[in-house]
Amino acid sequence: MKFVVWPSEIDSRLPRKYGRLVKKEVALEAPTPEEIRDAAEILGMKVIEFEPEKLNPRLSGIDEELRTKGMLRIESPYPKGKSLRMICEKIRELRAKKRKAHGKRKKR
């Protein structure tokens, strides 16, 4: 299945009115297009198109700080909802690893 993914679809700071598609508990704070791309690729999804500067038209009426740029066209064997949940989970893992690695460096 091919579909478009906007960072706003998994951003916990946004209400569903502005395009969040996953539950707030699953969503992430300020996901970047690069994080989404990396997570999708790790999960075996194919990133067909990547435009980090594109702005979701649904976000034109909200505060600048909440406007997350980026658009990805992804091909996945799973439906969009499941793919987004998987991507959120993977980004959460990657962020935890990054924090852990940062923490280890500081202790030395």
UniProtKB/Swiss-Prot annotation:
Short name of any one Pfam family annotated for the protein: SRP19
Keywords: Cytoplasm, Ribonucleoprotein, RNA-binding, Signal recognition particle
GO MF annotation terms: 7S RNA binding
Lineage, broadest ranks: Archaea, Methanobacteriati, Methanobacteriota, Thermococci, Thermococcales
Family per similarity comment: Belongs to the SRP19 family.
GO biological process: SRP-dependent cotranslational protein targeting to membrane
Physiological role: Involved in targeting and insertion of nascent membrane proteins into the cytoplasmic membrane. Binds directly to 7S RNA and mediates binding of the 54 kDa subunit of the SRP.
Keyword Magnesium: no
Organism: Thermococcus kodakarensis (strain ATCC BAA-918 / JCM 12380 / KOD1)
Alphabetical list of InterPro entries matching this protein: Signal_recog_particle_SRP19, SRP19-like_sf, SRP19_arc-type
Localisation: Cytoplasm
Protein name according to UniProt: Signal recognition particle 19 kDa protein
Subunit structure: Part of the signal recognition particle protein translocation system, which is composed of SRP and FtsY. Archaeal SRP consists of a 7S RNA molecule of 300 nucleotides and two protein subunits: SRP54 and SRP19.
Domain of life: Archaea
HAMAP family: SRP19
GO cellular component: signal recognition particle
Presence of keyword RNA-binding: yes
Leader sequence residues: none
Gene giving rise to this polypeptide: srp19
